[in-house]
């Protein structure tokens, strides 16, 4: 275990709020570890691990991946990286109070305590819908970098529909279709306040940041709140 206390940042925000964008920048600039449950699920499926086989079966059967399976996957990942970094971002986990309770219990069993911060991304549904409508993703499963089709955006690719990082073609995510966006927002709001209430009762730090600002301003504000050095 590292000598310094590991700080865990739990990003809570709707799809399209910029959690992944901020996470990726913090990984690149500061070397933090990032957990994206979506990417981790895809990794387990592609590697045909035991967890991956169960996730794949659930998805192909049209079922939701169970909380117990998600928890097992996350706990395995966390146990592997907690000794390697002082800062860990949780992006997309926990999504429900059941998952939060399980993860909280898991943290209490670690040899050394961690410092958990809850970061709530403040953004309107309308702003989310506009962002997702212009979202592009690298189609290379090993990359999956996110871009924006809006030319003035800081996320616009240098070459139209081509990934800056790996040169693969960009496309839209299947779940970014208009009707599905509304469904995903509804699902998010169903659990959001319950999660916040849970962490308040546990006396964790909860910080809200306005992510409707330009991304550079969001990053600067986050860096100031966390007292991070400028890089």
Task: Label every PLM stretch briefly.
Residues 1-231:
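Glycine-rich phosphate-binding loop of ATP-dependent small-molecule kinases
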